[in-house]
Amino acid sequence: MRHKIKGRKLNVTSSHRQAMLANMAVALVTHEQIKTTLPKAKELRPYIETLITKAKKADLMVRRSVLSKIKDKTAVEKLINILGTRYKDRPGGYTRIIKAGFRYGDLAPIAYIEFVDRDINAKGNIQQDANEEIKN
């Protein structure tokens, strides 16, 4: 029975899953929007939201705690200095998941995960990305 077992296995080992979530968190903090499969986006959401909730406090212990999770100093700086202050008054719900159809090769459900109130200049909008993929 799976009582009280949360999370998805994503068909990888636990160390691979932890590294993948950390790398996806760095990409999301850097670009403020990433395209991935729907189950990975659903797993990334609570992971990144706890990091942002910690980053809102912005002291040395929080910095070390976040750095132990994502291991990228520039992403930690942006998380604490920019995103922590941006979402200071928001009690949660920092990300949104937008379903974006299915991948051509294996029909995996694709989704965009992005920050609410994100900086549009950090990465292009969804329509512009879709037009570039069609051209290539």
Curated annotation (Swiss-Prot):
The gene is rplQ. GO terms for biological process: translation. Belongs to the bacterial ribosomal protein bL17 family. GO terms for cellular component: cytosolic large ribosomal subunit. This is Large ribosomal subunit protein bL17. Part of the 50S ribosomal subunit. Contacts protein L32. GO terms for molecular function: structural constituent of ribosome. Keywords: Ribonucleoprotein, Ribosomal protein. The lineage of its organism: Bacteria, Pseudomonadati, Pseudomonadota, Alphaproteobacteria, Rickettsiales. It comes from Rickettsia rickettsii (strain Sheila Smith). The keyword Ribosomal protein applies.
